[in-house]
């Protein structure tokens, strides 16, 4: 019910305008919103990252034109809406506004409430509020199922990327661990590089691994996550490898990662 109320409120709050017919997406996080919510016929171009293996909806991107995202190339596509998370110029709204092209900013949610709100508003702007409402409803149902699970015996958990980054408060990863029933051991704000000795000396009950087997990180032996001492610590700890596509953008589909963490926390 809450999802439907929010969707209708957004629908009537947004200025009346036709659904965009020539959408250009500037980065692979924006691609996910466009691929999930827009008709294929509405998409003029996606970013060159739309078919990366950490692009959540990469299968839907097959056959759709790609753009490098330069101003000249995008304008040549005659878009009536540009969608971005981080791609293009930092002041994209002002830059494209000079040419009469509106910009929709998406992604970057710090938690699932923010992800839901961004999803619903993007769906309205792309002309398909019912699709956003359906995805938000699925998200809420899955969050409710996680909340109903018995508490894990030891909820202590930590996220670690192959680059040595770990997530603290105010991040989607922190929200993901919490939704899974875990207790994030990093209580500081935002992201930081984890001191390796902390992991080696006091490994948590569960380490959620990100991008350890992804693309170039698979081949880079110099990354902090490849350090022999770290590998030994991880061998002693319980680990779960998170699907790269679920955590590459701060969006609603991070629920996949939450479910993976929840299962690992409660595994015998």
Where in this protein do the model-derived segments appear?
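Short, structured coil segments at secondary-structure junctions
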Residues: 39, 60, 98-101, 180, ...
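Bacterial N-terminal signal peptides
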Residues: 2-15
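Extracytoplasmic substrate-binding proteins
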Residues: 19-22, 81, 91-165, 183-189, ...
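Alpha-to-beta junction loops
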Residues: 78-82, 202-208
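Short secondary-structure boundary segments
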Residues: 27, 86-87, 189, 210-214
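Short, solvent-exposed loop/turn elements at domain surfaces
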Residues: 31-36, 51-56, 165-169, 209, ...
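Alpha-helical, coiled-coil/dimerization segments enriched in small aliphatic residues
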Residues: 48-52, 60-63, 166-192
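A short, structured surface patch at a secondary-structure boundary
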Residues: 22-77, 81-87, 91
């Amino acid at each position: 019910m809450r999802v439907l109320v929010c969707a209708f409120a957004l629908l009537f709050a947004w200025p009346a305008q036709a659904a965009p017919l020539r959408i250009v997406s500037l980065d692979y996080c924006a691609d996910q919103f466009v691929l999930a919510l827009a008709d294929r016929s509405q998409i003029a171009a996606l970013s060159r990252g739309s078919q990366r293996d950490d692009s959540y909806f990469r299968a839907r991107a097959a056959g759709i034109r790609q753009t490098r995202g330069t101003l000249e190339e995008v304008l040549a596509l005659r878009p009536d809406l540009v969608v971005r998370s981080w791609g293009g110029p930092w002041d994209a709204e002002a830059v494209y506004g000079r040419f009469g092209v509106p910009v929709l900013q998406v992604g970057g949610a710090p938690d699932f409430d923010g992800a839901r709100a961004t999803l619903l508003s993007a769906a309205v702007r792309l002309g398909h509020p019912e699709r956003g409402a359906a995805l938000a409803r699925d998200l809420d149902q899955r969050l409710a199922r996680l909340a109903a699970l018995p508490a894990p015996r030891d909820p202590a958990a930590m996220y670690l990327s192959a680059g040595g980054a770990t997530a603290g408060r105010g991040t989607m990863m922190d929200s993901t661990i919490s939704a899974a029933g875990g207790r994030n051991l990093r209580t500081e704000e935002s992201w930081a590089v984890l001191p390796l000795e902390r992991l080696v000396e006091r490994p948590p009950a569960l380490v959620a691994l990100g991008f350890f087997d992804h693309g170039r990180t698979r081949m880079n032996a110099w990354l902090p996550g490849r350090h022999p001492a770290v590998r030994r610590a991880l061998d002693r700890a319980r680990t779960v490898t998170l699907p790269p596509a679920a955590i590459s953008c701060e969006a609603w589909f991070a629920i996949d990662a939450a479910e993976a963490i929840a299962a690992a926390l409660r595994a015998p």
